[in-house]
């Protein structure tokens, strides 16, 4: 019985460790997922901007401008957002990913959105070059 418990504890510890490690930022998919986490889940535009170039960076800059003066911090009621990867098209220099997000508010309402994330390989690694949202 003690051996089984040790195995379960080790498996749980390993799972928690792997979850805490985050995404592999050396891959296009890892960068796309990190961007989605910061932009849509955590609503941290400054962090999301770190993973962008080109059109994506201009869009984030505009979102920052439009939301200036609106404090989003630990006290802000944020929706619960879960997402899944639906499709991916990966290449050596450019890749695209389609995610579906489920957004749930505290009042029990929910809706889904699809996020298309385009990435490209830059001299400093993979970056999000464009993103769009649809119903």
Kindly give the residue locations of the regions a language model identified.
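Exposed beta-sheet edge and beta->alpha loop/turn motif
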Residues: 89-135
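Bacterial N-terminal signal peptides that target proteins for export
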Residues: 1-9
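C-terminal motif of bacterial Sec signal peptides marking the signal peptidase cleavage site
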Residues: 17-20
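Short N-terminal leader segment in a subset of presequences, especially plant chloroplast
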Residues: 10-11, 63
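Short, aromatic-enriched amphipathic alpha-helices that serve as compact interaction elements
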Residues: 26-44
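Short solvent-exposed beta->alpha transition segments
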Residues: 45-94
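Bacterial signal peptide processing site
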Residues: 22-24
């Amino acid at each position: 019985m003690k051996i089984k418990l040790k195995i379960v504890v080790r498996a749980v510890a390993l799972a928690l460790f792997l979850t805490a490690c985050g995404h592999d930022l050396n891959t296009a998919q890892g960068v796309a997922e990190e961007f989605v986490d910061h932009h849509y889940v955590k609503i941290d535009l400054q962090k999301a901007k770190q993973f962008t170039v080109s059109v994506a960076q201009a869009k984030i800059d505009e979102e920052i401008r439009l939301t200036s003066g609106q404090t989003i911090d630990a006290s802000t009621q944020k929706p619960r957002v879960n997402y899944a990867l639906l499709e991916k098209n990966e290449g050596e220099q450019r890749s695209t990913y389609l995610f579906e997000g489920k957004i749930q508010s505290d009042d029990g309402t929910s809706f889904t959105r699809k996020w298309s994330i385009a990435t490209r390989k830059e001299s400093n690694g993979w970056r999000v070059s464009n993103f769009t949202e649809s119903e």
